[in-house]
Amino acid sequence: MSSLPQEAALPITNTLFPPPPPYFQAFTDEAIERYETLTGKSLFVNDEKGKTKGKEKKSDDRDMSVDIRIQDLTEEEQNEKLELEGKLEKPRADWVNEDGRWMCFGTMYTTEPIIPTAQSIGLPPFIDPAVEPQESLPPLLHSFLHTLLLLLDTLTMTARTPNELAAAGWASEGDQYIQHLTNLSANMMVASNQLRSAQSEATLVLLMEKELEERRKQTEKLRSKCKEIASGIRALKGL
């Protein structure tokens, strides 16, 4: 009995499988039964309509009885019904499309993918927005390597006094270069993300070229096999 609380307190990294999402706890037998009582419809069975006239009439009668039942609900039951519908029914996809974003497990997502820019994440503008990303990456890489050499040169020099570093607002002599390297790396990542469309196009071209080369090889094998069969037939005819 004492091992149960210990197992429950284990972090996610020590478990074999990740825990299920918390909203599954809302699907209890009592909640489902109460939902079906208040709404007059089953939660998991889809009603098939429009197949036959008899079924259509039966469905219309059932909808009318459901509407009458909903009208007879008290205000407290109406609020309970709305709460259960929000917990148990499928999410409204049209609301997601209208809002343009949706939340999943604590993370906000957008219906249209947005590639971040240096300005949107607060980086110093090292890249001219008018310049293509593939043209701005080589200068960034050159600046990165140059700053790295300056950092190595600074770290191999004679150390300065702590008072001199404190007056400059640095914890170490390499702080300015480390910060510059960080900004350069972030700008390079932003520029690389902006090349996704070009990368996808290049990948598609490579796949098509590979498929074309494979088809050529198969065609060549078929031709060689046909020549082999034809030579065999001619040899048989000459007997």
UniProtKB/Swiss-Prot annotation:
Ranges where the record places region Disordered: 1-21, 43-66
Q: Name one GO biological process term.
A: regulation of transcription by RNA polymerase II
> What Pfam families is this protein classified in?
Med7 (PF05983)
Has UniProt tagged this entry with the keyword Transmembrane?
no
Report the InterPro entries cross-referenced here: Med7/Med21-like, Mediatior_Med7, Mediatior_Med7_sf
Q: Which controlled-vocabulary keywords does the entry list?
A: Activator, Nucleus, Transcription, Transcription regulation
Q: Which GO terms describe its molecular function?
A: transcription coregulator activity
Q: Where is the composition biased (Basic and acidic residues)?
A: 46-66
Q: Where located?
A: Nucleus
> Quaternary structure?
Component of the Mediator complex.
Family, per the entry? Belongs to the Mediator complex subunit 7 family.
Could you tell me what this protein is called? Answer: Mediator of RNA polymerase II transcription subunit 7
Q: Which organism is it from?
A: Cryptococcus neoformans var. neoformans serotype D (strain JEC21 / ATCC MYA-565) (Filobasidiella neoformans)
